[in-house]
Amino acid sequence: MGIIKEIFGKVRIYQLRSRVDSRGFMSYVFDENIYDFSIKEARIYSMPKEGTFFGIHYKEESSPMTKLVTVIKGKGMDYVIDLRKGSPTYLQWESIELSEEN
């Protein structure tokens, strides 16, 4: 498990540590010995219809929030937009396809 990509110096894409054997599939979603942040809240969402747009989440720099997003089944797009005024990457964006494979 490690960082495979960093976006805007703030957003990190991690490769989860997982294994498959005769018993099935196992993946570490969070390990405090690896990540440099803590988790205060956990949520699980289900989007049963293809093409569902879930929402836009915005946080002020003065009250940052760490989010750990993973896809258990299927795939989805996650978008990151730099809205920090004065940032050299202001208004730039990237998309990341998340899936059960990554």
Model-derived segments and their meaning:
Residues 1-101:
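Non-catalytic, conserved peripheral segments adjacent to functional cores
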